[in-house]
Amino acid sequence: MNRKKLLIIAHAPSENTKKMADAVVKGATNPEIEDVEVVSKAPLDTQPDDIITAQAVIIGTTENLGYMAGLVKDVFDRCYYPCLEKTQGFPFAFYIRAGHDGTGTQRAIESITTGLKWRLIQEPLLCRGDFQEDFLSQCENLGLTVAASLDAGII
């Protein structure tokens, strides 16, 4: 069986957001998941082919002025047209580290991915307010759930 690729694109400008990104990777690389290759990239390092060659993606962003991080938006700007015809139905999930409510960021991501015709496979994870250690277990669970679903052929 060919290994499936799960791409994790995470904007992690702080120690806490780096911990969250690492927790997503930790969940996705659970040793019981056998046929999934996890590739984690920063937004600036992500190219259209990274998305096109993946079977699913998890996007992590901060909420910046009620919107997604500029570097995450840059990924969509650079990858939108190269991916548009090649990734329709593409399974994805995302998490937001929101100092406030995260709804503007969520709407923006959902708007762009609707245009791409991607398929949201998990409710968005909104980590709101002051940082809580529970965010890490939620992020780990997100990575585990998406990778296990990909491994099992559910997505």
What is each residue range found by the language model?
Residues N2-P31:
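N-terminal beta1-alpha1 ligand-phosphate binding loop
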Residues E34-D45:
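A short beta-strand-loop structural module common to alpha/beta enzyme folds
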Residues A12-E15, L65, I96-D101, L126-Q132:
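Short histidine/acidic/glycine/proline-rich micro-motifs that form metal-
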Residues P43-L120:
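Helix-loop-strand module that forms the ligand-binding subsite of alpha/beta enzymes
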Residues M20-A21, L71, G104-T105, F135-Q138:
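Residues at alpha-helix caps and immediate loop-helix transition turns in enzyme cores, especially N-
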Residues A28-D35, L84-K86:
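Short helix-capping segments at alpha-helix termini
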Residues T29-P31, Q47, R119-I155:
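Glycine-rich phosphate/pyrophosphate-binding loop and the adjoining helix
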Residues I9, K41-P43, E123:
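Conserved beta-strand termini and adjacent loop/short-helix elements that scaffold enzyme active sites
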